[in-house]
Design a protein with these regions (language model features):
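Short, surface-exposed polybasic/aromatic micro-patch for ligand or macromolecular engagement
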Residues: 2-58, 233
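Major-groove DNA-contacting interfaces characterized by cationic-aromatic clusters
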Residues: 53-60, 101, 146, 157, ...
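N-terminal core-binding DNA-recognition domain of tyrosine site-specific recombinases/integrases
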Residues: 19, 24-30, 57-62, 67-148, ...
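Short, basic/aromatic-rich helical patch in the C-terminal catalytic core of site-specific tyrosine
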Residues: 15, 108, 131, 135, ...
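Basic, Lys/Arg- and aromatic-enriched nucleic-acid-binding interface segment
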Residues: 11, 121-129, 140-201, 209, ...
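Catalytic-site neighborhood detector that most strongly recognizes the C-terminal catalytic loop/helix
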Residues: 32, 156, 164, 219, ...
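Short, basic (Lys/Arg/His-rich) helix/loop patches that form interaction surfaces
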Residues: 118-121, 172-182, 191, 240, ...
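C-terminal secondary-structure termini that scaffold catalytic or DNA-interacting sites
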Residues: 1, 175, 210, 219-246, ...
Length: 372
């Protein structure tokens, strides 16, 4: 039965139609034009096959956020904390009582602009991603016909400042640190381990015979002082080569120790935390060495730089750093490989100069002379 619009005794206009299951649906309007417009939209959606039960779309953002979070049980605790924080601080205060169907694209554009006033581009992007993922799930669940967050402009990110130390600068920094933290920073600078990966190392992860350190675990700091031990960031355990000079130092450091204890610990003991190591040991050493500003993550940058300078290709650097793909390595450290391309051209030039030198000087070819 086709839908229809009829005027009720109370003066309201009632629009009626039957959904895909044959159930009658109705809504009342004060104006006939609004009733006809709504009915036409429902019938069009039914014809396209993307009709949504209006009752399902009336669930609030707060209610739906719990459904969405339940689908994220696989997340690392630290990532889940970030999602929950975005919901608690930004999403729910603004949208918690709003029905999914009442959110508009324009509303989201204004909301993102408001967040940017107080928060960084990275934080704003993350908050928008949380909202967009919730709406995307609602579309897949048949509660919305489209994700109104699609097309909302994300703030442009600024890359963290990269800093590449020379071999001499690494030595200067290490000289300002007490044992074994001098060994720690040199290990970071020549293996590219993330700080959490270094904190997760056990003595048995160091293979002195092969000159490898195996990254099996990573330690993440949670809010309120919590810690979480998990597989490395890409969930891929990896063996990272260690330069011979560093193997010698590690041999002296681990000899006589059982395999199970952490390779590095806090003082006077316990798990090594970046939140303690950086302000109490690393930052003062950086100042004394005259290398400020510098962060522990810059030692990872340094490892990439030293590897490329030694002739390592992008695939080798990717495996060393534990990136998900070589394209990610190129994206993060494109400048390093630009310099490598210059070196390739110079080496090709040196190899070809003897054979093609006269041609390169403009000598031309016999065939070209005959043609003239």
């Amino acid at each position: 039965m086709a839908g229809n619009v009829k005027k009720r005794p109370d003066g309201m206009w009632r629009a009626r139609y039957r959904d895909a299951t044959g159930k009658e649906r109705a809504r009342h309007f004060t104006r006939k034009a609004d009733a006809e417009r709504w009915l036409a939209a429902q019938e069009t959606a039914l014809a396209r096959g993307d009709w949504v039960d209006p009752a399902k779309a009336r669930v609030t953002v707060e209610e739906w956020s719990q459904v969405w979070l339940a689908t994220k049980a696989h997340l690392r605790p630290r990532t889940r904390e970030k999602y929950e924080s975005a919901l608690r601080v930004w999403v729910l205060p603004r949208w918690g009582r709003v029905a999914l169907a009442d959110i508009t694209h324009a509303d989201l554009v204004r909301w993102v602009a408001e967040i940017q006033v107080d928060r960084s581009p990275a934080h704003t992007r993350h908050t928008l991603i949380v909202m967009s993922q919730m709406l995307k799930l609602a579309v897949r669940d048949g509660r919305l016909t489209r994700n109104v967050a699609d097309g909302v402009a994300k703030p442009r990110l600024t890359r963290p400042v990269q800093r590449f130390l020379s071999n001499d600068e690494v030595a200067r920094l290490a000289a300002e640190l007490p044992e074994p933290y001098d060994l720690l920073v040199v290990l970071l600078a020549f293996t590219g381990l993330r700080f959490g990966e270094a904190a997760g190392l056990q003595v048995g992860d160091v293979d002195l015979e092969r000159g490898r350190v195996t990254v099996n675990w990573s330690i993440s700091e949670l809010s309120r002082g919590g810690l979480h031990r998990d597989a490395p960031k890409t969930y891929r355990r990896r063996a990272v080569p260690i330069p011979a000079f560093l193997v010698a130092r590690l041999r002296a450091y681990v000899t006589g120790k059982p395999d199970d204890p952490p390779l590095f610990t806090a003082r006077p003991g316990g798990t090594l935390r970046n939140s303690n190591f950086r302000p109490y040991f690393f930052a003062p050493a950086v100042e004394r060495a005259g290398l400020a500003p510098l962060t522990p993550h810059n030692l990872r940058d340094t490892a990439a730089s030293l590897a490329v300078a030694s002739g390592a290709n992008v695939k080798a650097v990717q495996r060393m750093l534990g990136h998900a793909s070589a394209s990610m390595t190129l994206d993060v450290y494109s400048g390093l490989f630009d310099a490598e391309l210059d070196d390739v051209a110079e080496r090709m030039n040196a190899a070809a100069t003897e054979a093609l030198g006269s041609w390169g000087a403009g000598g031309g070819s016999a065939a070209e002379g005959d043609a003239r």
